[in-house]
């Protein structure tokens, strides 16, 4: 595998003449192939011939005539370690770029690379070749990955991130799976909170028949937000229908007679007798609903 040091050593050994910066980059490409184990079998005019790839010649040739065409370069290589399969490389100067195309004998598609010449060639014409190049490491790396490795059939490495089994198999958790304790719940302060019987008060979240813009009468005996006379929080061992002064259970699908119940305390507590909560006389026309509408007389009514 070529690197910038071996490529520069090949350039110094060949001592090629450069007419411009495109020449410098084109010869650096040639030196990268030689440093990767390829031998040059044709360059210049013979490399542009139609039979350049099909020629049986495997002889190593010199670099004479490699830049005889202005802005066009061609090289034919063979690699003895890879069955002497031939490779044709052509470079075309276009403005400040050098377009590189390479194809192997019998290959289906060519490898392609666009190189910005100014990123790798200096304007210096000094005898020291190292002063005429810059960023040679990147140029050699790009040639290796985009041209040479593809011609050799090496797959391009793809960065991937290994995911743990918990990332790939674990389903998202939308609900709290903390178990609900059946016994008394002890607060860190030491206060014991007894569990409340019933379903926890969910019936008023799911309206039944007659649901509309006005709320219906709350649940009765189902632990809803609106506490009724048969609420299990007051009578956990029955429906409350046998308590004195309480009406019987409602008919299926129908609320009990009268308005909806407002919350009141358990029986026997002074000031919370059920008889104190009676149905108000009908309101006259034009009166607002006390729970759902603004007070009559304007928004500043007190």
UniProtKB/Swiss-Prot annotation:
Lineage: Eukaryota, Viridiplantae, Streptophyta, Embryophyta, Tracheophyta
Keyword Protein biosynthesis: no
Family the entry assigns: Belongs to the proteasome inhibitor PI31 family.
Domain of life: Eukaryota
A Gene Ontology BP annotation from the UniProt entry: negative regulation of proteasomal protein catabolic process
MF GO annotations: endopeptidase inhibitor activity; proteasome binding
Region: Disordered, residue numbers: 151-188, 259-302
PTM sites of type N-acetylalanine: 2
InterPro entries associated with the record: PI31-like, PI31_Prot_N
One Pfam family it belongs to: PI31_Prot_N
Keyword Ribonucleoprotein (UniProt): no
Descriptive protein name: Probable proteasome inhibitor
Keywords on record: Acetylation, Proteasome
Residue spans of biased composition, Pro residues class: 259-269
Function: Could play an important role in control of proteasome function. Inhibits the hydrolysis of protein and peptide substrates by the 20S proteasome.
GO CC, one annotated term: proteasome complex
């Amino acid at each position: 595998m070529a690197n910038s040091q071996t490529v520069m050593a090949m350039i110094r050994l060949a001592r090629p003449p450069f007419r411009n910066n495109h020449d410098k980059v084109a010869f650096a490409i040639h030196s990268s192939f030689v440093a990767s184990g390829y031998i040059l079998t044709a360059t210049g005019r013979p490399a542009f011939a139609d039979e350049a790839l099909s020629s049986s010649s495997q002889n190593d040739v010199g670099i004479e005539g490699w830049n005889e065409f202005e802005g066009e370069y061609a090289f034919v290589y063979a690699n003895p370690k890879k069955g002497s399969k031939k490779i044709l490389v052509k470079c075309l100067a276009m403005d400040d770029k050098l377009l590189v195309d390479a194809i192997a004998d019998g290959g289906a598609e060519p490898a392609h690379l666009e190189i910005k010449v100014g990123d790798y060639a200096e304007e210096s014409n000094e005898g020291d070749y190292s002063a005429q190049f810059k960023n040679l490491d990147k140029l050699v790396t790009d040639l290796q990955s985009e041209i040479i490795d593809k011609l050799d059939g090496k797959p391009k490495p793809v960065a991937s991130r290994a995911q743990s089994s918990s990332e790939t198999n674990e389903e998202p958790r939308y609900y709290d799976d903390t178990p609900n304790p059946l016994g008394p719940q002890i607060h860190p302060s030491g206060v014991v909170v007894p569990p409340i019987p019933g379903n926890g008060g969910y019936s008023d979240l799911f309206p039944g028949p007659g649901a509309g813009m006005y709320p219906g009468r709350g649940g009765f005996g189902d632990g809803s937000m609106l506490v009724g006379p048969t609420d299990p929080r007051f009578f956990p061992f029955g429906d409350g229908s046998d308590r004195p002064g309480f009406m019987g259970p409602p008919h299926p699908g129908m609320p009990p007679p009268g308005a909806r119940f407002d919350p009141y305390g358990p029986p026997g507590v002074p000031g919370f007798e059920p008889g104190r909560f009676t149905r108000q006389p009908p309101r006259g026309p034009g009166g607002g609903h006390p729970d759902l509408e603004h007070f009559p007389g304007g928004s500043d009514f007190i």
